[in-house]
Structure formats: C-alpha cells, structure tokens
C-alpha cells in the first residue's frame, strides 16, 4: 500500500478489525519510511447487479434510488437515517446473495416492503399503496386489516412447539 504522506510502497499492518456486519476489515498501517500512520478499509468487490425493469430495460442497481424510496415512505416518521442505511445494505446483500447478475425490479420492491413492515407500519402502508397502485380507500382498509391479522398471528406462531 502506498503511503499517503511520502508515497513509499512498504508499510506494516499494526491492527486489523472486522466490522460488526463482517463485510469490511479496517486496518491501521504505519509507513516503514516516515512512520506516518493511516487507516485502510478492505471490502469484497461484488459484481454489479443489473435491474430488469417491467419493460425489460436494464439498468445498474442504484443504492440511492432504494434509499430515496425508503426515505420518502418514512418521511415525518420516527425512523433514523442510520436505520434506513442499514435496511438498504441488508436489501443489497440479500439481492447479491440471491441473484448473480440480474434482478427483477419487482424483487427489489418486495425486499423493500419486507424491511418497511419490520421498521414502521405507517411507512409500510405508504410504500405499499404506491407500489401496488392503490386506487381507493377499500384497498388501504384491506391492507391494514391484513396487517392486524398478521400481527395477531405472529406472536402465537412463535409460541408453537416445533414437531
């Protein structure tokens, strides 16, 4: 690694730590010529995923586009930007795990919906209403009723013994 201070190519790693999520390694280095200390980060370089749109056009997966959708859904809700950033990273990791080169845009929408359901119910309803193109109040009521039913069932399912 080239020293950022003097340009020398030889250094020594004095400390390495893995990030909490296990995707990045932080390394403290010292230049063997000038003793300047600096930090580097090492990550796996993933192949770029392409998004297949409804009209079969393809474009690069855009992290910012996913984040904008989450931010819009969570507008004026008690959800931190850190939580939304984590959700985007989780979505992208899941997409890379499940798809090699291309991912349908509908799959991204489903992942966003899953994350929002766990983060904030109002944000979930906002996003789903646009994603599924709700056209009347009945569709909102139906979705909310389904959410309530799911909320009642989930705690019961967790207590059932596995046979």
Swiss-Prot record:
InterPro entries hit by this protein: ATP-cone_dom, NrdR-like_N, RNR_NrdR-like
Presence of keyword Zinc-finger: yes
Cofactor(s) recorded in Swiss-Prot or TrEMBL: Zn(2+)
Residue ranges constituting the ATP-cone domain according to the UniProt record: 49-139
Alphabetic keyword roster: ATP-binding, DNA-binding, Metal-binding, Nucleotide-binding, Repressor, Transcription, Transcription regulation, Zinc, Zinc-finger
GO function term, MF aspect, one: ATP binding
NCBIfam families associated with the record: transcriptional regulator NrdR
Protein name per its UniProtKB record: Transcriptional repressor NrdR
Species of provenance: Akkermansia muciniphila (strain ATCC BAA-835 / DSM 22959 / JCM 33894 / BCRC 81048 / CCUG 64013 / CIP 107961 / Muc)
């Amino acid at each position: 690694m080239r020293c950022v201070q003097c340009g020398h190519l030889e250094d020594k790693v004095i400390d390495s730590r893995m990030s909490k999520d296990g995707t990045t390694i932080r390394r403290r280095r010292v230049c063997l010529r000038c003793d300047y200390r600096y930090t580097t980060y090492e990550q796996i370089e993933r192949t770029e995923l392409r998004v297949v749109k409804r009209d079969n056009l393809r474009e690069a997966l855009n992290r910012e586009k996913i984040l904008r959708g989450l931010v819009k859904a969570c507008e004026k809700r008690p959800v931190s930007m850190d939580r939304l950033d984590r959700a985007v990273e989780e979505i992208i990791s899941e997409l890379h795990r499940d798809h090699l080169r291309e991912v349908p845009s509908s799959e991204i929408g489903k992942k966003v919906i899953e994350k929002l359901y766990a983060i904030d119910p109002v944000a979930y309803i906002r996003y789903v209403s646009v994603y599924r193109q709700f056209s009347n109040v009945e569709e909102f009521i139906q979705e909310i009723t389904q959410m309530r039913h799911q909320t009642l069932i989930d705690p019961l399912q967790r207590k059932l013994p596995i046979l």
